[in-house]
């Protein structure tokens, strides 16, 4: 019998981290396998093993809408109020041949139910409906909470986990056979949901995310990042749902298939919605066309299929015929070490030699400024160090906040959260405290590295359970109870022991970085050769990747960058994959870029040419005094700072990098000799415009956009606080609302925040807003621009009603619409003046409307 991990007391007080709690209870944590699951029968087992197909059901919301569900009704309450309607729809899917019937619990979390019913009661009623319909397998459906997690929103990871855990326990009690987590856009949120399933049940977990037209989720996660992370944290089947039609999702699913061995599932929409001549929302892809498009995905290796918005029992019947005549196509990921943030993958293939620079600067050892920042809780400075290293060429950031006088568990959690909101790079969590390590990796959105274990049995006993439970990578140091050995063979022996111990937890060599530990040449000159030899042995015999803290070699010697860069080149020749170094060192980075050409990692030398096209040889200093001055420093300037593009505007740098900690003081300083409107129009607005361009180019994603907007908000608030009333011009009035019947307001809130920071006066009417209330506000406030949001197809009717009312009563008003179910064509059909695909587009439309 599975025993859930008890991590909170009855009053909600945290008792222990899950792995610590399990360890005290005598449990041994290892990488989860299929044998750890409670699987109903062999058919379901075959699907989870990837040797058999499985057919989920199709759309429920659009079927309910067709059955007469009123706009604004909570579908989950129909399990009590009209259970026969739910059962009838599900019975149609059973008769169409669906293996899995999804319980009507998509929005059955306490946040969305908001007291309308208990989570337990909804799950019990929903599962009863599915059983009554004759379902072979009933899936407990877990959808998004409907609130942004920190740092973008106010909901903590732990609060999200608790909401999901309540659903999981309710599902287990109601008798579900598996869980399906779907329509997720936030990698941190889906991680919380998967962990809640794993830690509160032993049932199979299917997990899918939703992707935009650009191939990324709302928060910028790619299919590869999603698949790697979901695989790592223990989803048994992973994939894509909703999003678009099956033809558009084929390429995204194919990308997932290249990075995971887990079964991949797809539940596509029947195309994108439109409004027909009678005012009804319809989907155009019919069953034969749908099945034909899905057939291509099945040929690629997708083995679990179903449908989402607009699909019907007819669509599923066509899929039943398709999969009954097909055996799953095998797929295998190419062996590699993959490290991810929520937006970026750093991939080190096992059959090649690729370099990943791990930035070392977020480590308080010997850095007084960072030490003081950590004591003061100044995480803005920590973030600035991460951003600088990203701009200087780091691929991964090491994060170490270890000072004896601070609460390391609290600070490392906050630091990783803030770094993930401001940089795109994956993180390496560096701590000797297992509690601090778990606090960071548990809440980390992606697949990180833990730094580190070593050959001491106690350390391996503490750290490997974390690596196994959270699916991370790990650094293994070649030291043990006897210290650091002198010889290559002794170092290799420790590495071999680390790899063997890791295997006991199901951790393969493709998740291990061995660090053979660099000793300074000033006191251990002969050790350099032994270090390189040890690394070569590890690479050849263990199949691991290797890391080295290369800066240590030159400690205590003059011209440190010179010696360090030569050692770095030698280490690359011996097989070094991940140098832990200062990316701000010119000589180190020169060596990295040069080696990438010689190893053919930089194909066509394009990166090298881009970096060095205008290079001045520092050794020609006798003939060129300017070169001598340039050669006197070994610092790589961060991109976007003075010296690279000539723009030394501190406001611009702080807004673009999302650094809000210092912007208030800088704004106050500039106000001493700048007019307030000059500061806004010539400093803040251009910076926000630049962020918008970076967002459009795919160089920034929503977390970075939000961090920049928050930094700008702090600056604007400072200006408003210090300036007399009326001195700051109002750029225009805008009203935003989520339409009647729709309780989702994440997108609308993001738009409001950005428009606020562009200087507009924004009236936020909230969610589930009646058309008459919107009209009343527009008339009373003399508003020229209205933004309407809808996430569900069932509420687009209310959006159209609101648009028609506004245009009839206030002819001059302009209306922007946005939301996951909308397209430019759909927006035009329902009468909107503008369609905004994202918040940045809303800001540009506002500038057009108000003539700014």
Regions from the PLM with identified roles:
Residues 1-513, 519-852:
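Domain-level signal for soluble alpha/beta catalytic cores
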């Amino acid at each position: 019998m599975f025993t859930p991990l008890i991590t909170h007391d009855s009053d909600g007080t945290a008792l222990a981290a899950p792995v610590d709690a399990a360890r005290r209870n005598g449990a041994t944590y290892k990488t989860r396998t299929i044998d750890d699951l409670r699987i109903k029968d062999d058919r379901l087992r075959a699907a989870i093993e990837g040797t058999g197909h499985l057919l989920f059901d199709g759309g429920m919301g659009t079927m309910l809408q067709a059955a007469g569900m009123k706009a604004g009704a909570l579908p989950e309450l129909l399990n009590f109020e009209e259970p026969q309607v739910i059962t009838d729809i599900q019975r149609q899917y059973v008769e169409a041949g669906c293996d899995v019937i999804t319980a009507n619990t998509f929005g059955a979390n306490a946040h969305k139910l908001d007291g309308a019913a208990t989570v337990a009661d909804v799950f019990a009623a929903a599962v009863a409906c599915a059983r009554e319909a004759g379902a072979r397998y009933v899936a407990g459906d877990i959808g998004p909470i409907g609130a942004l997690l920190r740092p973008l929103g106010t909901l903590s990871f732990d609060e999200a986990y608790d909401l999901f855990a309540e659903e999981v326990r309710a599902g287990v009690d109601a008798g579900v056979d598996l869980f399906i987590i779907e329509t997720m856009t936030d990698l941190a949120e889906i991680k919380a949901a998967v962990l809640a399933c794993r830690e509160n049940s032993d049932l199979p977990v299917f997990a899918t995310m939703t992707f935009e037209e650009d191939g990324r989720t709302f928060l910028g996660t790619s299919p590869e990042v999603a698949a790697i992370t979901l695989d790592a944290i223990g989803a048994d089947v992973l994939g894509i749902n909703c999003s678009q039609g099956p033809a558009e999702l084929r390429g995204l699913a194919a990308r997932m298939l290249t990075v995971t061995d887990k079964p991949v599932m797809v539940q596509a929409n029947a195309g994108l919605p439109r409004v027909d001549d009678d005012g009804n929302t319809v989907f155009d892809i019919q069953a034969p066309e749908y099945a034909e498009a899905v057939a291509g995905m099945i040929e690629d290796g997708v083995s679990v299929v179903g449908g989402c918005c607009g699909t019907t029992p007819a669509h599923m019947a066509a899929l039943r015929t398709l999969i009954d005549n097909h055996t799953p196509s095998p797929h295998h990921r190419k062996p590699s070490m993959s490290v991810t943030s929520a937006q970026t993958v750093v991939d080190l293939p096992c059959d090649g030699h690729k370099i990943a620079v791990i930035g070392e600067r977020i480590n308080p050892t010997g850095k007084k400024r960072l030490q003081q920042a950590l004591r003061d809780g100044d995480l803005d400075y920590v973030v600035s160090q991460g951003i600088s290293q990203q701009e200087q060429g780091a691929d991964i950031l090491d994060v170490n906040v270890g000072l004896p006088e601070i609460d390391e568990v609290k600070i490392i959690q906050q630091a990783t959260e803030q770094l993930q909101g401001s940089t795109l790079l994956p993180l390496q969590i560096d701590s000797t405290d297992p509690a601090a390590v778990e606090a960071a990796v548990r809440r980390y959105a992606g697949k990180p590295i833990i730094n580190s274990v070593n050959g001491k049995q106690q350390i391996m006993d503490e750290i490997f359970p974390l690596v196994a439970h959270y699916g991370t990578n790990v650094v293994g140091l070649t030291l043990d109870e006897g210290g650091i050995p002198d010889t290559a063979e002794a170092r290799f022996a420790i590495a071999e022991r680390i790899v063997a111990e890791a295997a006991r937890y199901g951790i393969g060599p493709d998740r291990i970085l061995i660090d053979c530990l660099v000793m300074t040449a000033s006191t251990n000159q002969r050790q350099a050769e032994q270090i390189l030899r040890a690394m070569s042995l590890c690479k050849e015999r263990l199949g691991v990747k290797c890391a080295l803290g290369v800066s240590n070699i030159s400690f205590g010697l003059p011209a440190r960058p010179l010696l360090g860069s030569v050692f770095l080149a030698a280490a690359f020749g011996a097989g070094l994959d991940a140098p832990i170094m200062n990316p701000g060192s010119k000589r180190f980075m020169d060596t990295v870029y040069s080696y990438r050409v010689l190893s053919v990692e930089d194909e066509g030398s394009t990166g090298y040419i881009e970096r060095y096209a205008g290079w001045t040889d520092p050794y020609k200093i006798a003939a060129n005094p300017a070169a001598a001055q340039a050669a006197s420093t070994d610092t790589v300037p961060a991109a976007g700072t003075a010296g690279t593009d000539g723009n030394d505007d501190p406001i611009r740098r702080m807004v673009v990098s999302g650094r809000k900690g210092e912007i208030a003081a800088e704004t106050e300083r500039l106000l001493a000799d700048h007019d307030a409107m000059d500061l806004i129009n010539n400093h803040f607005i251009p910076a926000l415009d630049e962020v918008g361009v970076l967002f459009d180019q795919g160089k920034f994603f929503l977390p970075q956009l939000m961090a920049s907007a928050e930094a700008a908000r702090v600056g604007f608030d400072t200006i408003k606080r210090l300036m007399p009333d009326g001195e700051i011009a109002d750029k225009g009035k805008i009203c935003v609302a989520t339409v009647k019947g729709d309780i989702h307001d994440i997108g609308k809130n993001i738009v409001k925040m950005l428009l606020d920071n562009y200087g507009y006066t924004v009236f936020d009417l909230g969610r589930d807003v009646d058309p008459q209330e919107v009209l009343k506000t527009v008339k009373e406030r003399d508003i020229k621009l209205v933004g309407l949001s809808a996430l569900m197809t069932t509420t687009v009717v209310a959006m159209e009603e609101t648009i028609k009312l506004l245009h009839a009563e206030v002819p001059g008003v302009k209306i922007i619409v946005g939301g996951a179910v909308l397209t430019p064509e759909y927006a035009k059909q329902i009468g909107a003046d503008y369609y905004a695909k994202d918040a940045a587009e809303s800001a540009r439309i506002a500038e057009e409307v108000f003539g700014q």
